[in-house]
C-alpha cells in the first residue's frame, strides 16, 4: 500500500506545537476592518489552539499522514 499523503489544505492552515496541541490562525482578518476596534484586530493577529479534542485529533490525522 502506498504512503498516505499529507492534506495540502490542512498543512497550510494548521501546525502542531511541541506539546502536541494544534495551532490555528483566526478568521475575520481580511477586509472591511474599519468598523473593528484596534483591540479586536490585535487579538485576531495571535494564533489560538484548537480546543475541541475531536477536532484536534482529526486535524492531526490529516497532518501526520
Curated annotation (Swiss-Prot):
One of its GO terms (cellular component) is cytosolic large ribosomal subunit. One of its GO terms (biological process) is translation. Residues 1-14 have a biased composition (Basic residues). NCBIfam families: rpmI_bact. Belongs to the bacterial ribosomal protein bL35 family. The gene is rpmI. SUPFAM superfamilies: L35p-like (SSF143034). The keyword Methyltransferase does not apply. Residues 1-20 are annotated as: Disordered. HAMAP family: Ribosomal_bL35. InterPro entries: Ribosomal_bL35 (IPR001706), Ribosomal_bL35-like (IPR021137), Ribosomal_bL35_CS (IPR018265), Ribosomal_bL35_sf (IPR037229). Pfam families: Ribosomal_L35p (PF01632). This is Large ribosomal subunit protein bL35. GO terms for molecular function: structural constituent of ribosome.
